[in-house]
């Protein structure tokens, strides 16, 4: 992947802006800012899928946002002509989307979205051609900047950066939208290059424009570092600075305090403590959604997030690439030592004394030692897979679980794992005899279809398939994988959809493969990717 251009759109930042003198809170104004943001993002987002004019130009919203923003998200209609073509070609493959978005036309979908909002009853007095089209641009970003120290009533200040072609027309149009929404309070509006900046107060908007002129987010070292880590630019870009963790903890705590969901016997917030634990080492994050080489792709990177069940220190998960080439779907995850401890503490904090009592009853019923036997059972990691030879119609006619080619492959101490399985089968009684268990080396396979369970012990060549390698690019070091091959076994997905309505069947036909994976690189940066390819 090529490195990302720092001038591309992104998410939220951290340069403080001055407060106005304290006065009455203006919650309604916050609603208008958010409302305008949502409407604009919706319009631009829809346009990103359908606009067919391929000229690009202008700077990204990050050039109009002050450096150090703590969070930022942007939508870009002009990432590149290539991505626009990819988006149109991919979405045209799905009949329902082609019909819904009218992708075959060259209409301005921003008009379509605006007029659909009007149909809901808002701003019917406005005309798109007269009040919006003359000034609206192709890029927009929503950002959060930290409030100045000592501001008791707010932690962040919202900022909407909207690309415009005419500053005066934009101000007039925005005021008209605000008026038709029934808000008499004036939004803060300021100019910053090709953008208008909207915030709750005029002083904030002016200060943000001045700050961006002095130091823009697009040139911020942390911002560009995270954009580089996330790969090529795209239509939607997201960014969270290190400082965003503290805001997230505060918001989670405030939510609990508002709802009364506090730690028993204390004023501490349960959710706040959980979020704080998850973000304790957080150093930043970024994400991009793009259209690339016939695929829809979302890529994310972060550092310092709690890894929970994911592989720690670059730990690789089970070798999914050695599953049978006929695999239709698989979910795989690596489990680090002590992975269950965090979950146990969470449940204990939620259930209190009832948790330990429930655990004791479960031990008595199953003969297991909990939670130790659960960790032993799942080993170092496991994969759950189903083969494309699954005969759905046959099962409908004659249900027999022994003919379901699905199973679990566990990696770890085979003797210890099978011992726990034996305990579970003994507790379940004779009906558990249908469960097939096999082991070979450090692999244990479990399922109902004897032939498939045996197959799971062999080394397959799923990793050699183009469908797999295209959507799981880092299979060799992935700690978690979800893979679906829609074309496996002569198109099992189409066969499954055969009984659905014609449009649903037609929408399944273009699907090729879906991959979701996560891994950690040598710098301990955590990566995640979702990729959906089409035929």
Regions flagged by a language model, labelled:
Residues 1-29:
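Terminal targeting segments of Actinobacterial cell-envelope proteins
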Residues 3, 23-156, 164, 175-182, ...:
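Structural boundary/hinge residues at secondary-structure and domain interfaces
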Residues 3-4, 72-73, 118-234, 371, ...:
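Single conserved position on a long alpha-helix in the C-terminal lobe of the eukaryotic protein kinase
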Residues 198-199, 298-300, 443-448, 526-532:
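Generic recognition of long tandem-repeat/solenoid scaffolds
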Residues 300-302, 333-335, 412, 439, ...:
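Active-site proximal loops enriched in glycine and acidic residues that flank catalytic Cys/His/Asp
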Residues 363-369, 373-375, 417-430, 490-506:
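Beta-propeller and related beta-repeat scaffolds in trafficking/envelope systems
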Residues 456, 460-535:
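Long, C-terminal catalytic modules of enzymes
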């Amino acid at each position: 992947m090529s490195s990302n251009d720092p001038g591309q759109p992104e998410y939220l930042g951290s340069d403080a802006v001055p407060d106005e003198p304290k006065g009455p809170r203006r919650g309604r104004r916050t609603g208008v800012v958010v409302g305008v943001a949502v409407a604009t993002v919706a319009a631009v987002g829809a346009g990103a899928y359908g606009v067919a004019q391929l000229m690009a130009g202008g700077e990204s919203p990050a050039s109009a946002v002050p450096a150090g923003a703590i969070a930022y998200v942007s939508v870009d209609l002009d990432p590149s002509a290539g991505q626009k073509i990819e988006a149109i070609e991919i979405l045209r493959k799905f009949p329902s989307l082609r019909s819904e978005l009218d992708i075959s036309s060259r209409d301005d979908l921003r008009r379509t979205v605006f007029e659909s909002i009007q149909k809901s009853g808002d701003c019917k007095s406005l005309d798109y051609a007269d009040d919006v089209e003359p000034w609206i641009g192709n890029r927009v970003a929503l950002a959060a900047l930290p409030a100045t120290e000592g501001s008791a009533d707010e932690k962040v200040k919202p900022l909407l950066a909207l690309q415009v072609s005419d500053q005066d027309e934009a101000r007039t149009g925005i005021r008209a939208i605000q008026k038709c929404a029934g808000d008499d309070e004036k939004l803060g509006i300021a100019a910053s290059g090709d953008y208008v900046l909207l915030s709750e107060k005029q002083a904030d908007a002016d200060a943000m424009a001045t700050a961006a002129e002095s130091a823009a987010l697009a040139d911020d070292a942390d911002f560009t570092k995270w954009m580089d880590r996330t790969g090529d630019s795209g239509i939607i870009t997201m960014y969270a600075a290190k400082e965003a963790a503290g805001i997230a903890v505060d918001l989670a705590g405030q939510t609990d305090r508002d709802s009364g969901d506090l730690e028993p016997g204390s004023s501490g917030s349960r959710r706040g403590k959980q979020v704080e634990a998850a973000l304790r080492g957080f150093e930043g994050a970024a994400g991009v959604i793009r259209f690339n080489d016939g695929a829809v792709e979302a890529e994310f990177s972060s550092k310092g997030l709690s890894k929970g069940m994911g592989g720690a220190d670059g730990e690789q998960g089970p070798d999914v690439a050695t599953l049978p080439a006929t695999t239709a779907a698989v979910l795989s995850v690596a489990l680090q030592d002590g992975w269950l401890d965090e979950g146990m503490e969470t449940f204990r904090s939620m259930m209190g004394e009832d948790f330990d009592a429930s655990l004791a009853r479960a031990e008595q019923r199953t003969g297991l030692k909990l939670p130790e036997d659960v960790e032993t059972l799942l080993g170092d990691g496991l994969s759950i897979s189903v083969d494309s030879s699954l005969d759905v119609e046959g099962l409908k006619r004659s249900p027999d679980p022994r003919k379901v080619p699905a199973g679990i492959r566990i990696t770890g101490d085979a003797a210890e794992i099978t011992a726990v399985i034996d305990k579970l089968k003994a507790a379940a009684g004779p009906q558990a005899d249908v469960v097939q268990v096999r082991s070979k080396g450090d692999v244990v396979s479990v399922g109902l279809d004897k032939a498939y369970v045996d197959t799971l012990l062999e080394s397959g060549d799923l990793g050699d398939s183009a469908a797999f390698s295209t959507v799981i690019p880092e299979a060799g070091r992935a700690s978690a994988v979800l893979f679906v091959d829609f074309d496996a076994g002569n198109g099992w997905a189409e066969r499954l959809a055969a009984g659905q309505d014609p449009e649903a069947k037609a929408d399944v036909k273009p699907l090729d493969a879906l991959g979701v994976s996560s891994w950690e690189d040598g710098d301990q940066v955590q990566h995640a990717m979702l990729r959906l390819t089409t035929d």
